[in-house]
Structures are given as C-alpha cells and as structure tokens.
Amino acid sequence: VSERSGVLITLEGCDGCGKSTQAALLCERLAACGLPVGPSSAPGAVIREPGGTAAGEAVRDVLLHGPEALAPWTEALLYAATRAELVERVLLPELGAGRVLVLDRFIDSSLAYQGFARGLGIDAVLAVNEPGLRGLLPDLTIVLDVDPLVGLARAGGAPDRIEAEGLDLQQRVAAGFAVVARRFPERVRLIDGFRDIDIVAVDVEAAALEAVAAAGLRRGG
C-alpha cells in the first residue's frame, strides 16, 4: 500500500492469552511516547476484530453469540467480509494519515482458527481474504504464547461460541499460530504470555517500538 505512512500492530493468540489486556496497555504506553495511537475518531483506542465498524460489530454478534454453530467456510467468509470493511473504512485511511493502529486480532486469527484448526487450509483462507486486505499486512504481529488450558481458565465469564468449543479447539489454534509464526517470520513475534502482566507488557512495548522505528526508516523519517 504505497500511500501508507502509519504503522499496523496486531496482537494474537488463543482465547484467554491476555492479548486484549496487552493491546490496551500497549496503546497507553505508545501514547505516552507521544505517538498518534488509535483511530483519529477515538485516539488511544484498540481496534477489535471482528468489529471496528458498524457492520463488523453486527456480524461479531452472529459469529460469537449466534444461536447455532456455523459451517467452517461460513465462519471464514464472515470474518473475511468484516475485515474487508474494516480495511476500507478504517485501516487504510488511518494508516494513510500516519496513525499507529493496534488491533486485537486480524488476518492471522483467521489463518490459525479457520485455516488450521478448522482444517480449511491456511493458503485457502488467505486467498479469500486477499481481495479485502488490498495488500495490507501488519508491520508487526505479536502472538502471546500461552498454554491453551491456562488460557481457558483465564478467560472466565460466559464463554462465547468459539470459547465454548473447549480445549481441543484451543490446542489446535495454538498449533495454528505456531505454524503462522514460522510461515511469516519477518513480521510475527512470539512472546511468552505466561508471565506477570507488566513483564509481558515491557516485551510487547519493546517489539512495538522497534516496529515503529523500522517503519520510520522505511518512510525516511
């Protein structure tokens, strides 16, 4: 995306890995560094997937809280559709304006959940997402590595439809993220999430600032 001047950072991992907490902390820390974090309409805010747009939030409810299980390809295509809307309406304009965007999940969740864990194939799921991505991939993807059993215990509360599928799915998802990390080593960083929140946050911030600095070098600044 040639007109892009911002930085896209995504946090990933199995359910209960702590990514939502770390995404919020990262936004706070980057903002404290004086960086223009989050969308201009909501400075400092994390963008979540599925969601981030009115259409995305509506489909999120179907995906995570619908009354019945969805066929794997239905699930994959709905995620791809909400992602295309997010890219068009939010990500490309905000990155073009030089914002630093922190996302709670993005394309790699589809690759790990639907591509690997659901058995649709990483290449097949990537292919259906590519038109909507319009060439956009993260500058940095942080995968918080946590034992899925610990993650499910951490998640707490009423589980969403995917969390309710239990440990077997989450173990396959964790394996899927490991495959994604090996597939895209230039942008995916595995960070041990089974530590104190503040210690993890230091590592997440360091990786993010490195990505911001690298992006600055790419735009000559």
Spans of model-derived segments:
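NTP-dependent small-molecule kinase module
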Residues: S2-E3, L25-C27, L149-G221
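Hydrophobic anchor at the beta1->P-loop junction of P-loop NTPases
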Residues: L11
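Walker A (P-loop) phosphate-binding loop of P-loop NTPases
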Residues: G16
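Conserved lysine of the Walker
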Residues: K19
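A glycine- and Lys/Arg-enriched "phosphate-lid" helix/loop adjacent to the NTP-binding pocket
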Residues: R105, S109-A175
